[in-house]
From Swiss-Prot:
GO CC term (a single one): cytoplasm
Cofactor, free-text remark: Binds 1 Mg(2+) ion per monomer.
InterPro entries reported for this sequence: Adenylat/UMP-CMP_kin, Adenylat_kinase_CS, P-loop_NTPase, UMP_CMP_kinase
Localization per record: Cytoplasm; Nucleus
Gene: uck1
Protein name as catalogued: UMP-CMP kinase
Binding residues annotated for ATP, in chain numbering: G35, A36, G37, K38, G39, T40, R160, V205
Pfam families named among the record's database cross-references: ADK
Species name: Lentinula edodes
Chain spans, region NMP: 55-85
Catalysed transformations (reactions): UMP + ATP = UDP + ADP
Annotated spans, LID: 159-169
Length: 227
């Protein structure tokens, strides 16, 4: 009997292939603990540098509920059976979103002659996801790492929880997310640090201060990558 992984692989045509995008495409992974301010800063960078902002979590949620989706039923089946959505699916959705964005033939800085600029928020969360993305889609140009203390993140998430309505914005869930981040995502950051690709930003300070530091670092990165 074929497993759910087999079914997903068949449906998504998940076969080994060369990376989809070449070095003209800038890919920045955006990582940090829950409440570190990743989404807030991504929104600012979109305005500053015309990035396309992709969230792996948002793509999965949208695909699950999209009418006519070829992946939605399979994602729902994984959830129903209590199994994790395979990394192949997440990577494929990111690849599709990037392909669709490039097909729009955007104008402006960073979007001519086959170029593109992507911020991928909250991904990769594990090393195998990083390896799969780099093999199938393309190499990461850099990793933006928003670092702060667990105390700061907890305070921010509890404050957000007062109005967000998110079930995971409570102390018990937050602590589990912290543990997952430390055990699974920190090794990803350490891996890219060894490659000299990590840009660490202290996100303990105000949103505006973090933005100024981030904008300066990304401007320097882009000027170097396009030189």
């Amino acid at each position: 009997m074929p497993t759910i992984i087999d079914k997903l692989s068949d449906a998504l045509h998940l076969h080994s292939h060369q990376s989809t995008f070449d070095s003209k495409v800038t890919v920045i992974f955006v990582l940090g603990g829950p409440g570190a301010g990743k989404g807030t800063q991504c929104a600012r960078l979109v305005e500053d540098f015309s990035f396309s902002h992709l969230s792996a979590g948002d793509l999965l949620r949208a695909e699950q509920h999209r009418e006519g989706s070829e992946y939605g039923q399979l994602i729902q089946t994984c959830i129903k059976e209590g199994s994790i959505v395979p990394m192949e699916v997440t990577v494929k959705l990111l690849e599709n979103a990037m392909t669709a964005t490039l097909a729009e033939r955007r104008s402006g800085e960073g979007w001519t002659d086959g170029q593109g600029r992507f911020l991928i928020d909250g991904f990769p969360r594990k090393m195998d996801q990083a390896e799969k993305f780099e093999h199938d889609v393309g190499k990461a140009t850099a990793v933006l790492f928003f670092s702060t203390t667990q105390e700061v993140m907890l305070d921010r998430l509890l404050e957000r929880g007062k109005t967000s309505g998110r079930e995971d914005d409570n102390v018990e869930s937050i602590k589990k997310r912290f543990n997952t981040y430390k055990e699974q995502t920190m090794p990803v950051i350490e891996h890219y640090e060894k490659l000299g690709k990590v840009i660490e930003i202290d996100s303990s300070v105000s949103i505006e201060e973090v933005h100024q530091k981030t904008r300066s670092a990304v401007a320097k990165l882009l000027s170097g990558s396009t030189a």
